[in-house]
Amino acid sequence: MPRTPSLPQSIITAQLNRVTSLSGLVPYSTLRKSAISKEMARDSFESTEDLQRRARNAPDGAFLAIDFVMVPHAGRTMEGVNYHYSGQAQTRLGHQFTSAALVQFGEDPVPLLERFKVSQALHTEHYPYRTATQEMIHVVQDCLAAGVPMAGLLLDGEFGRDAAVTFSREHQIPVLIRAKANMTVHFEGESLTLGALSKQFPPDRCHLYAEFGWRVRRLSVAREVGGFDVLIVWRKLHGEWTRFFLFSTFGGDGTVRSLLRAWKARWGIEVIHRFFKLRVSTPAGVVCHMTS
């Protein structure tokens, strides 16, 4: 007797066949549309139990990576969302999601959370508008409340630098964040941007980390919120040295090599985003099953 496919299997099969709505999913499942919606609602990224269950799949010593992903609409409407856009628009509109994952160098990323990040225009009591930094803090607090273990936070450049440092110290959670070249710091009695600081430390004045092929200089700097470390990272792209910057509150507990490995591990959340972007044009509930 053939085995009845589970709902997650039905969803995956449907999406492989380019299905982009709940209505289109029905022929691939033994359930009706209303029953599919109810089943999806039982397994969400929002509950404490879900966070705990997903976190159990992560390796020891994993870092919590938080980022945003924009998922474009599949057509003129997105089922279940009262939002339309002009077919004449030059830019395809979509919805922004907040995502979080536990990542570790050399290990598969473990998705923890995915939810809509609403605009000010769509603000409601149940779906409040938050800035990027407010959203990051909210996600971390949810994970802490669920007892999700984390060795530290890995954040991209859209999150507020000073607010992230303050939050890091208040909660004793170290952070590693990409910094922009125009970020101003105090270094050896001088106030200058990271871009200007990097000119004092070109590649030949930085240590080579052969594992990555990067040249890195770690410096102690300060801002109004206090002191922290900045990593000037030089890497070759198309034969030319280019630099990016990371700032860290890990202090002496993190070696440069371990910080670089942590940042490399952050790519895991980008891998998850590729999965979202390729397959997610349907309601958010579908994602819950596909990443389970």
Model-found features: residue ranges?
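A residue-level signal for conserved active-site and pocket-lining positions in enzyme catalytic cores
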Residues: 25, 100, 175
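Conserved active-site and cofactor/substrate-binding residues in soluble primary-metabolism enzymes
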Residues: 20, 95, 267
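Alpha-helix N-cap recognition
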Residues: 21, 47, 290-292
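Active-site-proximal, Lys/Arg-enriched surface segment
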Residues: 32-107, 217
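Short helix-capping/linker segments at secondary-structure and domain boundaries
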Residues: 17-20, 104-110
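Short linear Ser/Thr-Pro motifs
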Residues: 21, 34, 86, 248-249
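Gly/serine-rich nucleotide phosphate-binding loop at the start of the catalytic core
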Residues: 1-43
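Single, function-defining residue in the core of a domain
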Residues: 1-2, 8-11, 62, 109-292
